Amino acid sequence: MTNIRKTHPLLKIVNHSLIDLPAPSNISAWWNFGSLLGLCLMIQILTGLFLAMHYTSDTATAFSSVTHICRDVNYGWLIRYLHANGASMFFICLYMHVGRGIYYGSYTYLETWNIGIILLFAVMATAFMGYVLPWGQMSFWGATVITNFLSAIPYIGTTLVEWIWGGFSVDKATLTRFFAFHFILPFIIAALVMIHLLFLHETGSNNPSGIPSDSDKIPFHPYYTIKDVLGFLILILLLTLLVLFSPDLLGDPDNYTPANPLNTPPHIKPEWYFLFAYAILRSIPNKLGGVLALVMSILILAIIPLLHMSKQRSMMFRPISQVLFWILVADLLTLTWIGGQPVEHPFITIGQVASILYFSIILIFMPLASLIENKILKW
């Protein structure tokens, strides 16, 4: 008799996705981040669900309800910090996953890559709205500053901002709708993940060499299931260490002060995972220009496949591109640092140089390096 996992309509899908899936024999630990992102999403949905049971999305009680969760709910503090730091883990995995895609040329799977970009935007939107919910000082002012950027859109800007706010400032209506969106988006993200995987399984996984691996495939289970489980254990260990030893390491102390529209914090800044984009935004003195640069800093991922000039897919055998890639990583770390600094000399200049370098590497230097490497191949 044929195994039920190969005949049952539902189990058949699981089987083709996770068990009998032919996978390249040489994919490294950089291919673990996809499954780790799935784990992060599950952790976030579960902890978020339990937080939503005790949270109230009203300006008068939001801050108190979060305090209540941490003080009075059984293990509420644990759930709250798992959720807050789980977001940080989510973004670490996201950036590693995208970096892997750029390094090994995975972006040539266009559908998978583009759904991935939509996913990145969706996760960023969810994280931003989630940061507003505790209704602390940084929640309120972060929401005010970021939503205000939409007013830079010509003609409809101001109307658009007031429409999003549901009034003339960030208030009760804004908080309520942000909670509604923050709740629904992760499920939309989960659906997009399914589409992401659907497109990936049309082509099969890439591998570090960038060379087609059809002639050398191994079953996903047990080889990569056990490898993924090791990744899960490492991620859970790191998250647990963070939550139990320094849960506020990545947070902002200002968010322990209830939101006050009459008192602006000295330094308004987002969570660490948005600082690189925030630095790019601030490095342009013009409002509309800054907003465009902010959007382009992520949207630039969509044109990376068009800029692929190399005859090789992966950077594994392309030393010049490798050097540029790691300069890009260092540049992003520099931008992250600058985003958290006050707007004063020398940080302004460093931020502007780093921003120009970010776009230059992707748009100019990497394609040029690829062309040079193509020439070197002929020597």
From Swiss-Prot:
Keyword Nuclease set for record: no
Residues holding heme b b566: H97, H196
Keyword Ribosomal protein: no
Gene Ontology molecular function, alphabetical: metal ion binding; ubiquinol-cytochrome-c reductase activity
Positions with a binding annotation for heme b b562: H83, H182
Residues noted as binding a ubiquinone in the record, renumbered to the chain: H201
Membrane topology: Multi-pass membrane protein
GO-annotated cellular components: mitochondrial inner membrane; respiratory chain complex III
InterPro entries registered for this protein in UniProt: Cyt_b/b6_C, Cyt_b/b6_C_sf, Cyt_b/b6_N, Cytb/b6-like_sf, Cytochrome_b, Cytochrome_b_C_euk/bac, Cytochrome_b_N_euk/bac, Di-haem_cyt_TM
Annotated cofactor note: Binds 2 heme b groups non-covalently.
Superkingdom in the source lineage: Eukaryota
Note: Heme 1 (or BL or b562) is low-potential and absorbs at about 562 nm, and heme 2 (or BH or b566) is high-potential and absorbs at about 566 nm.
PANTHER family, per the entry: CYTOCHROME B
Assigned protein family: Belongs to the cytochrome b family.
Protein name per Swiss-Prot or TrEMBL: Cytochrome b
Organism annotation: Lepus capensis (Brown hare)
